[in-house]
Design a protein with these regions (language model features):
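Acyl-donor (CoA/ACP) binding surface of acyl/acetyltransferases
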Residues: 1-33, 67-173
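Hydrophobic residues in alpha-helical segments
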Residues: 26, 35, 57-59
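Conserved GNAT-fold acetyl-CoA-binding loop/helix
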Residues: 32-52
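Short, well-ordered amphipathic alpha-helices
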Residues: 51-54, 115
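Short, P/G- and charge-enriched loop/turn segments at secondary-structure junctions
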Residues: 53-55, 152-153
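A short helix-loop-beta-strand connector motif used in the catalytic cores of GNAT acetyltransferases and
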Residues: 54-67
Length: 173
């Protein structure tokens, strides 16, 4: 199901057909360094992750992470979405893109669309985001989206790693 489209992108729900793409994305060096190993090491693992995480989130929350495809040819380039994350008071916006599609404005474009969708369709007025402390690029994108660094936090399920918490306090620039 298509969620929305922007000038260059189409966001749709993750499905089994996206397993190969997901397997590639979650095993890229930047994903492993800044997000962590999600134990997705085969097509079967990717299929299970899509079903047990993404599809389950759509059913339980009414939102989740979505595949970001190029409008011109349907090629998946990344993901963007919303998460009701344990340990955060507000809904979390997140994104990740294949290395060859970074620094092309797709993160910004998909996230602006996601913020608009969250507000207009879901009634979510404020979002937050978390990043690895060393993930400078994501921090800059979040600031461009109208979020600002608030503090370092630890999520309940992760007792060793700290995250930067960004809080929405404005509109995208």
């Amino acid at each position: 199901m298509t969620l929305f489209s922007t000038e260059r992108l189409v966001l749709e729900e993750f499905q089994k057909k996206h397993s190969k793409f997901l397997l590639t994305l979650v095993n890229e060096p930047a994903w492993l360094a800044f997000i962590g190993d999600k134990n997705v090491h085969s097509i079967e693992d990717a299929e299970a992750f899509i079903e047990n995480k993404f599809r389950k989130s759509y059913e339980e929350s009414g939102f989740g992470f979505y595949v970001v495809n190029l409008k011109e040819n349907g090629e998946p380039v990344g993901m963007c979405g919303l998460v009701d994350r344990n340990g955060l008071e507000d809904i979390d916006i997140g994104f990740a893109f294949l290395k060859k599609y970074r620094k092309m404005g797709f993160g910004y474009e998909s996230s602006v669309g996601m913020l608009s969708y969250a507000n207009k369709e879901l009634g979510i007025e404020k979002v937050v985001a978390i990043t690895h402390p060393d993930n400078v690029a994501s921090g800059k994108l979040l600031e461009k989206l109208g979020l600002s660094f608030d503090k370092l936090i630890q999520l309940p399920e992760d007792d060793k790693d700290w995250c930067k918490l960004y809080v929405q306090n404005g509109k995208p620039k």
